[in-house]
Amino acid sequence: MRISIIFHSVCANNYLVAKTFYESFKKRGQSVSLFRVADPDWIEQKDVPLAAKENLKNMMGLPMATPEVMLESDLIIMGSPTYFGNVSAEMKAYMDLSAKYWVKAQLAGKKIAAFTSAGNPQGGGDLCLQEIHTFGMYMGMLCMPVPTTLIPGENIHPFGIIYYSYSKYGEKLDPKTQTAIEKFSEHLIR
């Protein structure tokens, strides 16, 4: 199975989620690649913690995603920051670039899963995940929900993984999010 993780990140929060997915698939012996979407307006943040600066630097060294990446993938993990209950403009632009594949349903049958970061539980992260799944459905892709049994006793949104940053820059993920990513990765390759 060829897995591509395609994400947009400004503060390195989504980069951390994407990287954790990447590492989880790698340790399970999967063929996985990590891509960031183009962000021509991105500027280096000055007043951020040192760990976040290092993560942002590493993120900027990743290859850019092209729509062709999706054609070459069996499973696509797509992630975007949540902006007003939606994906970022940069992720939407990336999605729109793939419109050429819609006419002939060239992405039909491929699996898609979603993740996002949001400032807090009221930040609209669920709506952002829904937008990624809506994109997948229009492209004929198979949307992969999070099973209710992923982590017994925990409430994980069925549309994907949400990392709540509480306005922090991408320094490290909380243990609950890390566990959810590990378990969801394992579920996706069954």
What are these regions, as identified by a protein language model?
Residues 108-154:
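Short, glycine-/small-residue-rich phosphate/pyrophosphate-handling segment
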